[in-house]
Amino acid sequence: MAGRVKIKQKELIDSTVKNKNVMNLFHEIIGSKGNINFSVVWPKFKKIKQSVYDYISTLSVLEKASVMQNFEADKKLLELFVQKLWAAYEGYFKYPEIEKYEVEGQVNFNLVPQCVLEKFSQLYRIRINSELVTLILNSCAFMSKYNDYILKKDPYILTITPGLCFSPIPNFEDLNFKHLYNSDKNSQHDKEFIMFILYKLYTAALGVYNAISIPDIDVEDLENIILSSVSQIKKQIPRCKDAFNKIESSVHLLRKNFNTYYSDYVGSGYNPTIIMEQYIKDISQDSKNISPRISYQFRTIIKYYRDMIATRHQTMDPQVLNLVKHVEKKLDMLDREKN
């Protein structure tokens, strides 16, 4: 049954590519025009939401713990800080929206009102790029430098490392784990509890980081669009068989390197062209023995796109022009390397 579904999906993409500009399809799958793949993005969002909740809950547990009775000033500051985090969480993550349409953890998005889906789409990137999520990611980056010690609950980082401060939360140096851990007022149980809190804080922050790093798209759909578009275009461009074969045979690079491409995409401010740029670059680097003849064929394909742009510039996405320029640039670099 699964195989049939994939075949139908491929047939649908083949049909769609015939009727749509391939870069517009690329935009739709990436989500850079406001469209998002709910079956991919919704589970990702839930993971982010849960990990953010776990992060704040861990700080809340510490604030209410008996060990903090020994640090009244720190406790009060932490209490106020946690209140601010919960307020931010309520603002960004507490909308029920799609949750109420879940049945046993699954959502049939065809049954969700369009207005609900549109609202989620509008708020999705605002939420995952919020100050709250950014704070947790920065906290994760700081703690990741001590990854092995924290995951092993090794107090070395709080006892032996230089400095008087170990504050894993940006802009909140009042939460100093070295100060808490090394107090003479603590029992051994208190010390173990403090290390456990640091461990839970880090694993929750890692959960946010890992969820954020999940691509918003189905890579297989993107592969199918590339293959289907090549299949359509090569019928219109004769004597470029070798170059088209190279593109088709190199689609595995997209899947292999996609996490890197996606990180670059996010870092570029969600510019989808960066994915294609990096993909073309990797095809070039993976083709050290590419001949001048194949290089010429690549340029013929690029010329085809340039001609399309010249005749349909008002209706075609301007990103196509950028893509063509990037491909030409990579081919020029390849030619220089061979000369």
UniProtKB/Swiss-Prot annotation:
Keywords of the record: Host cytoplasm, Host nucleus, Host-virus interaction, Late protein, Virion
Cellular location(s): Host cytoplasm; Host nucleus; Virion
Protein name per Swiss-Prot or TrEMBL: Protein H339R
Description of what induces expression: Expressed in the late phase of the viral replicative cycle.
Quaternary structure annotation from Swiss-Prot or TrEMBL: Interacts with NACA (alpha chain of nascent polypeptide-associated complex).
UniProt family annotation: Belongs to the asfivirus H339R family.
Signal peptide: none
Transmembrane segment boundaries: none
Disulfide bridge map: none
GO cellular component: host cell cytoplasm; host cell nucleus; virion component
Principal location listed in the UniProt entry: host cell
Record's keyword annotation contains DNA-binding: no
